[in-house]
């Protein structure tokens, strides 16, 4: 039995009874959908009609495996990401062309890399990047809103904001009743400095899918609108709904900080760091906020200010050894390629001051570099880092080098040096 109720009046709009076999479940679904559309006199767009007519998979078992994997993804914890993967891989084994399952795997691998959770999945950053690329490539052969949402997230992580917004627009155009496009657009609008518009899109996503956990996105928009009481209430709900998701505590602490609720902020920071420790991450510092991708610096500073008021420390002190002096640093870098400890980043320092890089996501960028007095290496990419100039100091540690922010607040990374341009950057 199926019924459609008007929630504003409590009256029945439509009801019917159906009998079917399990292997006919998709045909039954199509029939129910068409009857609901008729009852509501809905005019579907051409794209929606096409998607209704075209099945994403003919395998009920693949669909069931996808749903089980997606349920774990929605909990957004390291353990649940690890649990999601076998189900999603099983969905693809049952139907190798199942685009939504490929998109879901691309999402899990990319976000695990983004959250520093790859160890929980048993892969390296390079492997996570490659799996993301491969599954997204498959997903975009027959795209779903989820595929465009994932592409949008990857582009925004590279500060390619216009392209990221275009992908979110494609997700919405493909299916106006799928929440993924609205969630992607809402997130982006907050990042580019339009939180009021972003809030509208996030609320739309929540109306379309009340079961998904969009509370972090809602609280994020409220926070950047400086509606800190609302943000704190939202994020408190989020921590109760999903106590294993550390970033819920992170944003709650920032909201408490802005509200001057010092004791609550302190205990929330402690819980946040406790959850980080479970996945092998050290205590968070204010310097780590530099890694948050915002187009507008004011949005990042608002977050940093809240966390500072919450008692988050500035950062770890630089090593008590001498940084490399200017001339030694210039000789070290000129005409050489630095490769990150993970092997995912490669940067070639051309002798003419040009800079060429490739990230673990496969994206590339160009920029300029220079050595200034005091032994500081300064670089400015075209896209990465929002095109902002950043300066660092360097330390030699055995066969490796460390580079730290110029103020000594935090190590940025470790790398090895190779002569020339072996990566053809």
PLM feature segments, named:
Residues 257-280:
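TPR/TPR-like (Sel1-like) alpha-helical repeat modules
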Residues 281-319:
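Terminal, low-structured helical/coil segments at or just beyond the last alpha-helical repeat
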Residues 1-225, 230, 234-236, 245-249, ...:
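Acidic, proline/glycine-rich low-complexity intrinsically disordered segments
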Residues 318-368, 372-425:
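Lipid interaction determinants
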Residues 77-79, 310-314, 374-381:
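Short amphipathic alpha-helical segments with coiled-coil-like heptad repeat character
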Residues 240-247, 274-280:
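Non-catalytic carbohydrate-binding regions of carbohydrate-active enzymes
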